[in-house]
Amino acid sequence: MDKECKDISRRSFIGRTAIGGAGLLIATDILRPELATAAPKTANSTMMGVPFEATGRVRLGIIGVGGRGSSLLQDLLAIENVEVKAICDLVPEKVARAQKAVTNAGQAEPAGFPKGEKDFENLTKLELDIVYIATPWNWHVPMAVSAMKNGKHAAVEVPACRTLQECWELVDTSEATRKHCVILENCCYGATEMMVLGMVHDGLFGEITHGEAAYLHDLRGILTSSEGEGLWRRFPHINRNGNLYPTHGLGPVAHYLDIHRGDRFDYMVSVSSAEASLSAYVKANFAEGDPKRAEKYICGDMNTSIIKTQKGRTILLQHDVVNPRPYSRLNSISGTKGAFADYPPRVFVDGPKQEDWQNIDGFRVKYEHPLWKTTGDLARKMGGHGGMDYIMNFRLMDCLKRGLVPDINVYDAAAWSAPTPLSEASVAQNGTPQKFPDFTRNQWNSSNSAGFAVQT
């Protein structure tokens, strides 16, 4: 077996064993309703509204430089006064490639940490301001906790956590260490999403009563690949039945509804369809004897959930990554004066002559977000999901450098990730409502809550 095959096999084994362990955690969570019904008491004060300490220059480490981590690295290298000081990955060649990208950008070679699955702990002990985490999901919480306990802020890819216990671990650690844990939800920074948020805050749609969010993306090829995310991302479909990836759709809609800025998620119900598409794809594309043919998937092709908020509003939340279909996050809202729907983006404003949708371009001059006005050309040039990745990274680095309150905090990270275990519990109990924990400990309506991307 050559070195690459050995490496893939080792990582595949790590992914399988990690997911197996996750099944135990998940089962434990479903049987522990106290995690959802009461906020654990703590002597630590909230991180709501707490600004970063101004750094002027950001010293940064990245854990995980595969496809996603490498893309984040390119964005960060293009931002002024950001120094990439450390790189960690299980694959030495990926560390070396990332180090070369840093030196090619004119910076000193960052320290490399390729020595096994615990080497990230050495990275988090360096003199850094923030640690980016772009790894398989089972490592998000251990790595973020290590960063915060060693005095660094954490920026973690989506979803931030897999279980309610992990959600609370992030919240508790952030509050105890006074370090932020930011979820890297790039979809909150899309040009359309930020423009619609401005329309909402301007009252264009009146009082918002309903939103729709989803992740509808045909990932069959990625899930069954023999490299990259295919080494681990398919395995939750064997062990879990619910919404495995809620944040891309939910994050922007949560901002439209001012979640943790005047409202919060109260409870949700969830049902899953039968599983059929991933099994059919594997059967059609992999020969007899391939190990994938022996896998049994339990995650329904489509998971549909309804979230009710404390103020009585509703959110439709869906997940489907295995059916052939066009990409969509739904991304829509309804209010007393109008509505917005995406894919394609369009607006409806109530009025005597209004009978059909209007193209959103007619609203761009008034509502384009200042970040997109000033940085949009560079963001689009950088690429990364139409530029939203660069805007996200630029904004986070700017908040760090200037000492602003982060747009997205640990309470958002926990609440947006919580639909995974809650949907799983609801599906397992025939759609029984599941309460959301109040991760903010009753601070969700606090005046300390900063508006999203409005500080300048």
Residue positions per predicted region:
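N-terminal glycine-/serine-/threonine-rich beta1-alpha1-beta2 phosphate-ribose binding loop
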Residues: 2-152, 165-180
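Non-transmembrane alpha-helical segments in soluble domains
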Residues: 14, 73, 99, 144-145, ...
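C-terminal helical cap and adjacent loop that interface with cofactors, partners, or active-site loops
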Residues: 16-21, 25, 71, 323-456
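Predominantly a Rossmann-like dinucleotide-binding segment in NAD(P)-dependent oxidoreductases
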Residues: 64, 176-182, 187-297, 396, ...
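Short, acidic/turn-prone active-site loops that include or flank metal/cofactor-
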Residues: 160-162
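Short, small/polar residue-rich loop motifs at catalytic or cofactor-binding pockets
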Residues: 301
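Active-site beta-strand termini and strand-to-loop segments that position acidic
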Residues: 305-311, 335
